């Protein structure tokens, strides 16, 4: 009988609070983590949890059992992080330290940040929350490859529609969920909205390319779209590849 270890590595940074259609990225991440945790318990696998912002906020070592999985799910749903930034490297380094044996490490995050070097370009366009997105996967490429050599890393990237395309709502005053920076944006200009959408699409495509280069299976999900069928097909395809060797 097989016995795997599933490590859920879940981003609880401030950007996860964003959601334009009634569900935040954090809420969707919690749903996905719950689905994966229950699937693991049905397969008699161990489940562990790492919650991270710009530091590791919570660690639950992997164990079996329904009560343990329910504890994991409660933490994902209700944990209140102390910090709002994001540092994927910190989470991956912690995983490498605490998990000696091979695990399936599912990283659930938007994999997007707003580093200082993006600010000037961002002000020439417009931004949701409101910074042009940068790929955290790019900054963590070396650590991702290193982690994937020891473990089987899976990336579940969660985004929101309005991070990718701005609605024509005129003048908006918005606060960056991670930095606290307040900016005023003008969404009435169609050319700026188009330029914004083009750049965001390039960032998502670059993130997907980085995962492929690191040998990591990845799926992109959105808060405004059903995820069940897509997630199921993704893991079914992974299992078929595993069985083929």
Residue ranges and their predicted role:
Residues 1-63, 104-109, 115, 131-135, ...:
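An amphipathic, basic-hydrophobic helix/alpha-beta surface used to engage anionic
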Residues 32, 68, 72, 91, ...:
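Internal, well-ordered alpha-helical segments in soluble enzyme and binding-protein domains
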Residues 94-103, 115-245:
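Von Willebrand factor type A / integrin I
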Residues 27, 82-89, 127, 198-201:
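Conserved phosphate-coordination/catalytic loops
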Residues 31, 35, 86-93, 205, ...:
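Short, contiguous clusters of charged residues that form electrostatic/catalytic patches at enzyme active sites
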Residues 1-5, 15-21, 77-105, 114, ...:
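A structural preference for long, well-packed, hydrophobic secondary-structure segments
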Residues 57-86, 185:
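Short, charged loop segments at secondary-structure junctions
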Residues 31-38, 74-77, 93-97:
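A broadly conserved amphipathic alpha-helix scaffold signal in soluble, globular proteins
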């Amino acid at each position: 009988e097989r016995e795997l270890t599933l490590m859920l590595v879940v981003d609880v940074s401030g950007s996860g609070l964003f959601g334009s259609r009634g569900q935040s990225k954090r809420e969707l991440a919690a749903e996905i983590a719950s689905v994966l945790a229950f699937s693991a318990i049905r397969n008699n696998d161990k489940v562990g949890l790492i919650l991270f912002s710009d530091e590791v906020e919570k660690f639950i070592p992997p164990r079996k059992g329904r009560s343990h999985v329910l504890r994991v799910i409660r933490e994902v749903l209700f944990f209140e992080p102390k910090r709002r930034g994001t540092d994927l490297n910190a989470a991956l380094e912690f995983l490498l330290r605490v998990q000696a044996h091979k695990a399936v490490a599912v990283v659930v995050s938007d994999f997007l940040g707003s580093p200082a070097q993006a600010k000037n370009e961002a002000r020439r366009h417009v931004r949701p929350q409101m910074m042009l997105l940068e790929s955290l996967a790019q900054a963590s490429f070396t650590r991702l490859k290193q982690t994937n050599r020891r473990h089987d890393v899976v990336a579940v990237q969660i985004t929101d529609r309005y991070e990718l395309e701005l609605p024509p709502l005129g003048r908006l005053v918005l606060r960056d969920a991670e930095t606290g920076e307040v900016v005023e944006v003008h969404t009435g200009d169609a050319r700026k909205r188009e330029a914004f959408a083009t750049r965001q699409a390039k960032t998502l495509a670059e993130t997907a390319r980085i995962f492929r280069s690191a040998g990591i299976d990845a799926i992109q999900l959105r808060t405004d779209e059903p995820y069940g069928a897509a997630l199921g097909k993704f893991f079914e395809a992974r299992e078929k590849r595993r069985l083929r060797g």
